[in-house]
């Protein structure tokens, strides 16, 4: 749902939605009156919305828990609480595993580097540069709004996303460029609730149950890095998805699976070529 306060923005938002029709997206323009008839969570000030009919929402924590259970059910080994310090290589230069901070080496036939903004410092050991800019986003979780929206979406004028999750409402947004490790800017968190207050009922009476900030991995050219590293056999990269990690994660997995197994790719080869690690610098000393 693309929620819109200013009626003057409705036409532009509708045009944006229609421009995605060739990719299979269906949209419906809804007046403010009709929106509130369908869902009482929205304030009278909301002029209308563009409903993306094929969109969906989820609980990220439950999704990851389900994925973890599926991995274990298929014989996978998930290691928690261990830090990857580098890579293990065979005498011929092939990457054969990950070296943990404890000194243990986890070996495998193929190694996938998918460490988000930390992919670049890890790749540096191998002489590879993955130009990455951390872009911090914030979210705040609210309980007790009284009424939750039935759909998730984006508040058009503020670019703040909202997502009902069980009995709680999650608000997320901002794109704070800077190095990792800096203190949080609490005004960013306050801005999320201030934005939601303009669109949704019950924000003032709700209480905060969680606050969080995390780094989105933004590459220098805006494209993710997916595929085999030409100079290091056995090493594959899957990172740089910026704000689209959840959506692009599944297709990244399919691409890497085809790469590793040597099977036919389903994605357009020209588009895939733009994402390949071969465009990265390898001038660092390995």
Identify the residue ranges that each predicted region occupies.
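Active-site substrate-recognition segment that forms the wall
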Residues: 84-95, 105-233
């Amino acid at each position: 749902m693309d929620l819109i306060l200013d009626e003057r923005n409705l036409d532009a938002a509708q045009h944006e939605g229609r421009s995605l029709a060739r990719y299979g997206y269906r949209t419906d323009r809804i007046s403010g009156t009709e929106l509130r008839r369908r869902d009482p969570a929205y304030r009278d000030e909301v002029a209308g919305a563009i409903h993306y009919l094929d969109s969906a929402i989820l609980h990220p924590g439950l999704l990851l828990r389900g994925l973890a259970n599926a991995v274990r059910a298929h014989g996978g080994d998930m290691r928690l609480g261990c830090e990857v310090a580098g890579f293990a290589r065979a005498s011929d230069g092939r990457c054969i595993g990950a070296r943990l901070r404890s000194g243990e080496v986890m070996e495998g036939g193929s190694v996938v580097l998918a460490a988000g903004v930390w992919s670049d410092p890890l790749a540096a050991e191998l002489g590879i540069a993955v130009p990455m800019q951390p872009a911090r986003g914030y979210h705040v979780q609210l309980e007790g709004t009284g009424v939750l929206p039935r759909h998730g979406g984006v508040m058009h004028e503020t670019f703040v996303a909202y997502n009902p999750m069980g009995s709680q409402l999650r608000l997320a947004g901002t794109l704070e460029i800077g190095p990792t490790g800096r203190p949080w800017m609490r005004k960013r968190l306050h801005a999320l609730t201030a934005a939601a207050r303009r669109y949704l009922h019950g924000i003032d009476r709700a209480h905060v149950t969680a606050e969080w900030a995390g780094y989105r991995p933004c590459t220098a050219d805006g494209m993710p890095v997916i595929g085999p590293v030409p100079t290091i056999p056995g090493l594959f990269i899957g990172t740089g998805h910026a704000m689209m990690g959840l959506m692009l994660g599944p297709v990244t997995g399919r691409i890497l699976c085809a790469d590793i197994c040597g099977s036919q790719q389903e994605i357009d080869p020209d588009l895939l070529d733009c994402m390949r690690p071969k465009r990265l610098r390898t001038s660092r000393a390995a």
